Amino acid sequence: MAGSAGRRTLSGGIFLLSSLILAATGAAGNEITLREIVVTATRGPQAIARSGSAVTVITGEEIARAGARTLNEALRRVPGLDLTESGGTGATASVRLRGGEPGQTLVLIDGVRVNDPSTGNGQFDFSLLVPTGIERIEVLRGPQSALYGSDAMGGVVNIITRKGRGEPRAAIAAEGGSYGSRGVQAAVSGGDPRFNYAISLNGYDTAGFSRWGYRIGRLRARHPWPLENDGARRFGLSARFGFSPSEDVAFDVGGSAYVNATQYDAAFGAFPDTPSSSVQRLGQVHARATVHAFDRRLKNTFLVYANRTERDYRSISYYGSTAAPVTDWSKDGYVGGRVGASYQGDLSLDAFGLLTFGGQVERETLTSTSQPVLPVPGLRTTLDDAAQTTRSLFALHQIALAEHLNLSLGGRIDDIEGADRFATWRATLAYDIAESGTVLRASAGTGAKAPTLYQRLDPLYGNAALSPERSFGIDAGIDQKLFDGRLTLSGTLFLNRLRDLINFQSDPSCRPDQPFGCYVNVARADTSGFELAAKAELIPGRLGLDIAYTNLVAIDRTTDLRLARRPENTARIGLTLTPAPGLVIAPTLVLVDARYSAAHEKDRLAPYARLDLFASYEVSEGVSLFLRGENLTDARYEEVKNYGTAGRSLYAGLKASW
């Protein structure tokens, strides 16, 4: 059955891709160019038309026009990206790219890796971030380990913060609405050719709703008692400063701090609705120096960085009889640290292209502690105290052949202290027909994810002999602009083979003191499908259309069953209407297919349709009122089994800039 689904996916994708190519053939004569610049696809500025990679760019202006309240809402518009939240605002938010695991998505802030070394799978929790002070988000899909190393098996999400430009500017926004929610944002920025600055901060507070069981009829029927609300408080601060003493030298210093204090529930059990709470903190700093040499033929980039993630849990659970339950209460803490330095050189070879090369040294640390409080108090004990250093070398050669063809070939070697050394490669092709606004592209490469510190070195469950997870991925696509740029179409076919995936289970390779099991390289998986996107200016200045669609078949090859939390079909349809000067109305319809919450095709989650709407009106220059409606269809759905989602919600606020 899995094989037939994959064949249907491939056939349908080829048909749709062929249709786009035929449309491109008929578009000759439209003098259009695709000259948007991206930096993630090649570790440096490159016109998107010359990139063979599948990359989506979300600008800060697009985020503002859509009225995205969280970074999660902004990311949901990306084809090939799936995001799940465990019960509303403040809950753990996990991103999967093309069916990969959350820990197989590399997350960068201004080019610096921020995945959490203290988690079991190394994933980044997107609930920490809000879309304030963001200049753009670049989402690069497919294996990218040849450029970025471990964690980039599924792709890369690069969050680029705003850089100050021009006259000093300031902005402020405030809002309030359903579930006792209120938030405020503020930003200042400015700059000249020598110095620039940008600072932003935000705060958000919500009373929320019970993460377990909220608006889930089958659970409320079995557990009719009142549910306690699980609120959340978030704070974020980011700052970036730049100084250029000359045309050939530039310095960039930045940092950010985020705090997410939230309450949470268990997903299962006799008493899942508990007063448990957590506080998560992320702090990161970086300093970058760029020096041009040899008549600007060589650009040298030096980077040092550090980040630290702290997670503190007040875990409360109940067991025993309903008449006299026993309280189990513990305080658990996790700290993940990272410090590193890198060098990158970009050497112009004139007609022979551009050579990018460099190296990196990075040290990661993990500390975890636990202290029992009830029913028997105890002392705080250290469970994990581990560290590892990774040394890497990478190179990428890009060359333009003739007028239209652009090729790249790159590779990387990562050497992890006490673990396996691994090599990865990647090749891309882009055929840019500027006369017709057409780009044909393809890429192939390998990915790898090193075992996390917890998987390798945890005293109870770790396995120091683990090997990296591996993948091979290919994709092919077309980007086409029509009607003088008013319509942009994009289609991509993709296929990934994953092996040596790490699972926890009983295995002969486990140590004698691991009777319950350990982590082992045992699993295999395949993901395939196609991504479609369309942007259209239906009525210039009045009506715009934005569509993203993903078809995904993700199969666990050890069981030939579908992987959990991967819907086969996902679509997002957005309109932007400007019926009068200063008035913008943007409805969005999200359609998500059925999927399974747990492995082995267990806990089926029903499909759903959700309608959101954002409207803003500029009452005077620089001052706007806005209204946002979420889930106006009042759809009852779950992204994770037994965790509720918000019902029909309304929010209103004010924005001002000067």
Can you say where each PLM-predicted feature lies in the sequence?
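Short acidic/polar hinge/loop motifs at secondary-structure boundaries
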Residues: R113-R141, L460
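Conserved C-terminal beta-signal and adjacent last beta-strands/turns
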Residues: S189, S200, S244, A536, ...
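Outer-membrane beta-barrel signature, preferentially recognizing the C-terminal barrel domain
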Residues: A270-A293, Y334-G337, A386-Q388, D432, ...
